[in-house]
């Protein structure tokens, strides 16, 4: 299964993601979830970004929080709402929201 997971909070959801075992995992960071892609604690990125997955962050939510695509970790791609629709319909079979 190809699964896209929306992460909308900065609290860690790693244990839930560990229970999901899709063939392909996409993590779409929205709302406060975009902080996973930009914040560093003690010089270290969020442990969420250690998963084997494709990572995306919604541009509008970055900008709302005073951030930009240049603030993102190197393994996270900035995307628009239209890109999210394309991902859901073309790349992934199921979606979940954490």
Map each language-model feature to its residues.
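C-terminal structural segments of small proteins and small subunits
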Residues: 69-98
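Extreme N-terminal starter segment of soluble prokaryotic enzymes
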Residues: 1-4
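Histidine-anchored nucleotide/phosphate-binding helix
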Residues: 6-27
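Short, conserved loop/helix-junction motifs that constitute active-site signature segments
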Residues: 19-23, 46-52
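Short internal beta-strands
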Residues: 25-31, 53-61
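N-terminal beta-loop-helix "entrance" segment that forms/cooperates
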Residues: 33-50
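Glycine-rich, charge-decorated loop segments at or immediately adjacent to ligand/cofactor-binding or catalytic sites
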Residues: 38-40, 65-69
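Short acidic, S/G/P-rich loop/turn micro-motifs used as interaction or catalytic elements
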Residues: 11-13, 33-36, 64
């Amino acid at each position: 299964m190809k699964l896209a997971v929306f992460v909308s909070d900065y609290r860690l959801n790693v244990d839930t993601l560990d229970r999901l075992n899709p063939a392909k995992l996409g993590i779409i960071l929205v709302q406060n979830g975009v902080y996973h892609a930009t914040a560093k604690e003690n010089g270290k990125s969020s442990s969420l970004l250690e998963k084997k997955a494709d990572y995306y962050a919604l541009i509008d939510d970055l900008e709302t929080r005073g951030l930009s695509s240049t603030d993102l970790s190197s393994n996270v791609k900035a995307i628009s709402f239209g890109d999210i629709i394309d991902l859901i319909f073309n790349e992934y079979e199921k979606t979940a929201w954490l």
